[in-house]
Swiss-Prot record:
Protein species of origin: Rhizobium johnstonii (strain DSM 114642 / LMG 32736 / 3841)
Alphabetized GO MF terms: ADP binding; ATP binding; phosphotransferase activity, phosphate group as acceptor; protein serine/threonine kinase activity
EC code: 2.7.11.32, 2.7.4.27
Family: Belongs to the pyruvate, phosphate/water dikinase regulatory protein family. PDRP subfamily.
Taxonomic superkingdom: Bacteria
Record's protein name: Putative pyruvate, phosphate dikinase regulatory protein
Binding site for ADP: 153-160
Catalytic function, reaction form: N(tele)-phospho-L-histidyl/L-threonyl-[pyruvate, phosphate dikinase] + ADP = N(tele)-phospho-L-histidyl/O-phospho-L-threonyl-[pyruvate, phosphate dikinase] + AMP + H(+); N(tele)-phospho-L-histidyl/O-phospho-L-threonyl-[pyruvate, phosphate dikinase] + phosphate + H(+) = N(tele)-phospho-L-histidyl/L-threonyl-[pyruvate, phosphate dikinase] + diphosphate
InterPro entries the UniProt entry points to: Kinase-pyrophosphorylase, PPDK_reg
PANTHER family, alphabetized: PYRUVATE, PHOSPHATE DIKINASE REGULATORY PROTEIN 1, CHLOROPLASTIC (PTHR31756:SF3)
Keywords from the UniProt entry: Kinase, Nucleotide-binding, Serine/threonine-protein kinase, Transferase
Function according to Swiss-Prot or TrEMBL: Bifunctional serine/threonine kinase and phosphorylase involved in the regulation of the pyruvate, phosphate dikinase (PPDK) by catalyzing its phosphorylation/dephosphorylation.
């Protein structure tokens, strides 16, 4: 019998950089070896306008929702919508803050990002996060030369979570999907500053992740083609040929965590350290 890995969607919503939340989510998920999370990270969510698309993304791919949102109105909206969708939501900091308030006999300030010292490193991370979110999934292709790293790869190779992990370390990162037969943007080929790296994985790994990705998604997918191993093999072959043609390095993420993938990228460009 084929040894398959179970996957689940893990949505991480933060009004700051998301580092605290990512660490908590990974610490918890590491205790469950039978399933691996597909991380969806949403940093810098500070108003209703920013939150509504996140809630739609959760509705499209239901799973566990963890959040660190100081604003009570936004936190309540997350909980209400998650109840409507029938998914679990956890305000990760609230029990800790309540314990502090009871022990200290004083209310919290409820200030966004209060744990961060406003130094140059913090502002560099925020700038990198803003850049990375603006350049996710092929968006805003005209200024790739402002990036430190551009990650390319076919669907479900962890481009977005790796990009956000790098951004949390002050590395401006864009990511672009490789779609079989669709040319990459011309601006990528003339960009001289960024390190361009391609993420790949085994056909079986990608197929498994994609099969779990389409669970609960009612529209927008040709499911059979999206998860077909032969089609995925062709996509990977196409990605490899692009990288060989342009001398772009490949990183196989099949057995790598996001942290390990990010470290491998940084190792390719020592000045990013």
């Amino acid at each position: 019998m084929e040894n398959r890995t179970n996957f689940f969607h893990l949505h991480l919503i933060s009004d700051s950089t998301g580092e605290t939340l990512i660490s908590a989510g990974r610490a918890a998920s590491a205790q469950f070896r039978s399933a691996q999370p597909i991380e969806h990270v949403y940093p810098l969510i500070r108003n209703r306008k920013q939150l509504l698309p996140v809630l739609q993304a959760i509705d499209d791919a239901p799973g566990i929702v963890l959040y660190t949102i100081v604003d009570r109105e936004l936190a309540s909206l997350i909980d209400e919508r998650c109840i409507e969708m029938g998914v679990a939501s956890v305000n990760v900091l609230e029990p800790v803050m309540n314990a502090f308030q009871i022990y200290l006999g004083a209310p919290s300030r409820r200030r966004v990002g209060a744990q961060h010292v406003m130094n140059a490193g913090y502002f560099a991370r925020i700038e990198a996060l803003n850049f990375t979110m603006d350049h996710d999934d092929g968006q805003m292709p005209d200024d790739y030369n402002d990036a430190d790293v551009v990650i390319i790869g076919i669907s479900r190779t962890s481009k977005t979570p790796t990009s956000i992990y790098l951004a949390n370390r002050g590395i401006k990162t864009a990511n672009i999907p490789i779609v079989y037969g669709v040319p990459l943007p011309e601006s990528l080929f003339v960009a001289s500053k960024p390190l361009i790296v391609c993420l790949i994985a085994t056909t079986d790994r990608i197929s498994q992740v994609r099969e779990n990705r389409v669970l609960g998604v009612t529209q927008g997918f040709d499911r059979e083609h999206y998860t077909d191993r032969a089609a995925i093999s062709e996509e990977l072959k196409y990605a490899r040929s692009l990288c060989a043609r342009h001398n772009w390095p490949l990183i196989d993420v099949t057995r790598r965590s996001i942290e390990e993938t990010a470290a491998a990228i940084v190792a390719l460009r020592p000045k990013l350290r």
